[in-house]
């Protein structure tokens, strides 16, 4: 009987240890170069590689699930995942719902439109601009530019397709993301200057964890500091942003 009890305790301990070593990340994988689905149906991108590097530092295993952007924080709250890494801006509004790590990427936003058609945001008055539903980009336009008609999309890739096909007049998104579009499509161009309003786009992008989970927050912060110091962060950055 003792052997059975000991075996059961060991088995229970092993299961707990295994669970503790796995960090389930949720993301929205239609946002290259931060995250996207590759030809092998795998989630890849800057965020994924960085998360893997952080997990390696803290001896954890990372798993990734793809979800709609507006379901990411609810998934975190309902404990379906331990962390969210999805090009998410650290904003005061979101900080009321989740804990963020220190910023891992400095961020700004940018309008894009058809080349030669618009040169300033003022010219988008009365026009249709695509945004991803539930993002700070959507809220920014609704609050600061009510004269612009926002068209919500479940992914920025769908918004880009509609822009290219003339169904909308512009798209508003993270500078790093839409700049990649400009490299691949000479028919698109930036409209106006970068937007850096901290009330909406915060102090950068962060990894979100549940409120109260300061242990995981600290582990990720420590790991992030290490990979920035040892050159790992720079290597990952250059892989995705210096092509």
Curated annotation (Swiss-Prot):
<dbReference type="GO" id="GO:0097638">
    <property type="term" value="P:L-arginine import across plasma membrane"/>
</dbReference>
<dbReference type="GO" id="GO:0016597">
    <property type="term" value="F:amino acid binding"/>
</dbReference>
<dbReference type="GO" id="GO:0030288">
    <property type="term" value="C:outer membrane-bounded periplasmic space"/>
</dbReference>
<protein>
    <recommendedName>
        <fullName>Putative ABC transporter arginine-binding protein 2</fullName>
    </recommendedName>
</protein>
<dbReference type="GO" id="GO:0055052">
    <property type="term" value="C:ATP-binding cassette (ABC) transporter complex, substrate-binding subunit-containing"/>
</dbReference>
<dbReference type="Pfam" id="PF00497">
    <property type="entry name" value="SBP_bac_3"/>
</dbReference>
<dbReference type="InterPro" id="IPR001320">
    <property type="entry name" value="Iontro_rcpt_C"/>
</dbReference>
<feature type="signal peptide">
    <location>
        <begin position="1"/>
        <end position="19"/>
    </location>
</feature>
<keyword id="KW-0813">Transport</keyword>
<dbReference type="InterPro" id="IPR018313">
    <property type="entry name" value="SBP_3_CS"/>
</dbReference>
<dbReference type="InterPro" id="IPR005768">
    <property type="entry name" value="Lys_Arg_Orn-bd"/>
</dbReference>
<comment type="subunit">
    <text>The complex is composed of two ATP-binding proteins (ArtP), two transmembrane proteins (ArtM and ArtQ) and two solute-binding proteins (ArtJ and ArtI).</text>
</comment>
<dbReference type="InterPro" id="IPR001638">
    <property type="entry name" value="Solute-binding_3/MltF_N"/>
</dbReference>
<dbReference type="GO" id="GO:0042597">
    <property type="term" value="C:periplasmic space"/>
</dbReference>
<dbReference type="InterPro" id="IPR054852">
    <property type="entry name" value="ArtI_ABC_transporter"/>
</dbReference>
<dbReference type="GO" id="GO:0015276">
    <property type="term" value="F:ligand-gated monoatomic ion channel activity"/>
</dbReference>
<comment type="function">
    <text>Part of the ABC transporter complex ArtPIQMJ involved in arginine transport.</text>
</comment>
<dbReference type="GO" id="GO:0016020">
    <property type="term" value="C:membrane"/>
</dbReference>
<keyword id="KW-0732">Signal</keyword>
<keyword id="KW-0574">Periplasm</keyword>
<keyword id="KW-0029">Amino-acid transport</keyword>
<comment type="similarity">
    <text>Belongs to the bacterial solute-binding protein 3 family.</text>
</comment>
